[in-house]
Amino acid sequence: MEKRSTPSLQITDRFGAQAAFASLRLPDGTEATVPAEHAAAIYVNEQPAFRVVCTPALLPQLALGRLLTEGWIASADEVEQIAVCAEGAKVQVYLRHPLPTRRAAAQEVASCCTDNIALGSPVELQPLRPVPGLALQPEWVERLTAAMHAGLPLYRATRAVHSCFVLHKGEIVFACEDLGRHNALDKAVGCAALAGLPLAECVLYTSGRGPMDMVRKAIRAG
């Protein structure tokens, strides 16, 4: 897996990964396995940016991916540190540069399918840019389709989450799950960015629909 050199990005995750699902007894006496839900607030340079409802895992990757795909940053190189508190309720992201005042202004904007809220003003975001052409090979699609059909662990247990795969040079290098397709994509992008992968050479394969906001996320990722 080819990587590019990046400035050191420090991650302090005191929360880690918690139980991904739980078994509940229904009124009729049967049991159902449901995914765990977790709420967290993402701050950028001490300013509130997003509130997310997600599965309780990969919070640093979710935060980094969200900033990339929403246009707050153009590269993971801009991030100096990501810190998650022990309860996982707050994710602090510190950039290597000040955050423009208007971008830090609090403004609640509904975002995607799990009650996520964007708290930052949607101005001064990174503009959309042309995406380099990537020749998609038929065998890549077959490999991704087979992996999606097989299902990831949380999906197999609950049948109630979305998945997103990252493919690089024909190999699946990351596979992420979450309650919402946007979160799953953000986690996948965050994983790839932390690994130093050239995102312009990667393929994202998602279980969710591909509406304009998801396409925009993929473009901003690279």
Report the location of each language-model feature.
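Generic structural signal for well-ordered alpha-helical scaffold segments
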Residues: H149, V189-A193, V215
